[in-house]
Amino acid sequence: SGTINATTADDGLRGKDSLTIAGGTLTVNSGGDALKSDQDNDDTKGYVSIVDGTVTLTSGGDGIDAYTDAIVTGGTLSITSGGGASAGKPSTGSAKGIKAQTYIIVDGGVTTIDAGDDAIHSNGALRLSSGTISAASGDDGVHTEVAAVLDGATVTVTQSNEALEGGLITISDGTVDLTSSDDGINASGSITVEAGLAAVAESSSDSTTTDTTTTTQQMGPGGMADGGGSMEDTGEQLTITGGTVTVNANGDGLDSNGSLTISSGKTTVYGPASGANGALDSNGAMSITGGTVIAFATNEMVETPTTTDGQGWVSAAATGSAGSTVTITDSSGSVLGTYTSLKAFGNVIYSTSGMTNGSTYTVSVDGTATEATAGQGGMGSGMGSGMGPGGQGGQPPAGGPGQGGQPPAGGPGQGGQPPAAPQG
C-alpha cells in the first residue's frame, strides 16, 4: 500500500535479485529503464512481478526489463517507453514496453503500453492467459524469439509494424484484435529454445539490425518468386485452435514461414487492398479444418489451403470497397454468413462448419454475385516446396510452447515462484 513517486536520470526502481509490486500506487519517470531486475547468475532470480496496485511508468529505456521473467497477474499497469509509438523505434538502445529474457506471463490485470520499440518482447517464450492488454508500438506489438501462447487474454494492438511475431504461435482462446503496417501475425523465428538463444546472442553481437521477416515476392511464371524472398518451409508454426481473432494488416494477414493451421474459433482477416501480399500466406502446409474464417485481400496474391480434406472453403474473385457488405450462401440459398469489409478487396476466402469441398457457394458483394466451387481457386501455399503440402516439425501442444515445455501458469519459467507479496 502507499504511494511512491520516483523521477530518475537512469533506472527507476531496480531489484538486484527480484522486484515485486504487490499494491499501492507507483509512478516512475526514468531516463533509463523504469522497473528492472538484473540478477544474471541465478535462474530463480532476476524477475519482475506485478501482483496488484496502480503502476504508471514513463521511461526513456524499457518500461520493464527482467533478466529472467516478467509476470503480471493483477493491478493496473500503464507504460510509455521511448516517447511512445509515434516516436518510432530508436536507432540505438532499447525502448520496449515489457522485456524479458526467458518468459513473459500475463494472467490478469489491465495493461496499457505505448512503446517506441516492441510493446511486449520475450527472448524466450510468452503466455497471455487472462486480463486485458492494449498496445501501440513503433515496431512489433507482441514479439517472442521462440513461442507465443495466447489462451484467454483480451489483446488489442492498435499500431505496429508486425502485430504478433514468433517462431511457434498458438492462439487457443481469448479475443485478439491486431492492426499492423506490415504482417498481422508472422510465424517467423526460432522453433527451439537453443536456436532462440543463439539468435539472441547473434543479434546482440551485431551492431546492424536485421529484419528476420521473410518478404513475400510477386509471383513470376510457374509459381516461382521474382526476386530474393525465401519461400522455404523452415518449420515455424502458426496455429489457431480457438478464440476470436481479427487482423487488419497492410502486409500479409496471417503469414507463416512454415505451416498455417486453423481448426476452431472465429478468424477475420482484412489484408492489403493492393500489392503482392495476401490475407493468408504460408511456406508450408496450410489447412482449415474447423471454425469460421473470412479473409479479404487483393486478388494479386491469393493463397489457399493445400488440402481439401475436412471442412470446405471457397476462394472467390469478388471485388468490393471499404464498407461493402459480403454475404455467403449455399446452393439452397441459405445464408452462411454476412460481413462488412473495412477495406477495398479483390478476393474473398471463406470457410465455416458444414461447408463441403466440391459444392457450389455464392459470394455476393453489395448484391453482385460470384459463384465459387469449394476447394478450388487461388494457389496452394508452399511455393518453395513444389506448391504442395509442406509442414515441418511437430505440432506444438495446444496452449504451450512447442519445444521448451509449458511455462507455469503465473510463475517464472526457469526458477521458483515469485513471492505473492514483498518479504521482510
Please place each PLM-identified region on the residue numbering:
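A composition-driven surface/loop motif
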Residues: S1-G424
